[in-house]
């Protein structure tokens, strides 16, 4: 599945790379919300996808933090 490959890619990244990816995803979500509010967003399901990706990134960061302890 597509999500499994995405999670595997995330798990291969370092913590700093994950944090950079998280910041980029949050910026994208911010922009998507503004586009949605101004009726410029055609694909509204993209908001849901980005939110789920943010959760996946945060989960991998949490797993790496627990493994480090």
Swiss-Prot record:
Covalent S-S links between cysteines: none
Single annotated GO MF: structural constituent of ribosome
Keywords per UniProt: Ribonucleoprotein, Ribosomal protein
SUPFAM superfamilies cross-referenced by the UniProt entry: Ribosomal protein L29 (L29p)
Family annotation (PROSITE patterns): RIBOSOMAL_L29
Record-linked CDD domains: Ribosomal_L29_HIP
PANTHER family (UniProt xref): 60S RIBOSOMAL PROTEIN L35/50S RIBOSOMAL PROTEIN L29, LARGE RIBOSOMAL SUBUNIT PROTEIN UL29C
UniProt xrefs under NCBIfam families: L29
Record protein name field: Large ribosomal subunit protein uL29
């Amino acid at each position: 599945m597509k999500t499994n490959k995405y999670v595997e890619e995330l798990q291969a990244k370092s913590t700093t790379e994950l944090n950079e990816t998280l910041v980029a995803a949050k910026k994208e979500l911010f922009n998507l919300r503004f586009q949605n509010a101004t009726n410029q967003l055609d694909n509204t399901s993209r908001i849901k996808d980005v939110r789920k990706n943010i959760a996946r990134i945060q989960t991998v960061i949490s797993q790496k933090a627990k493994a480090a302890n």
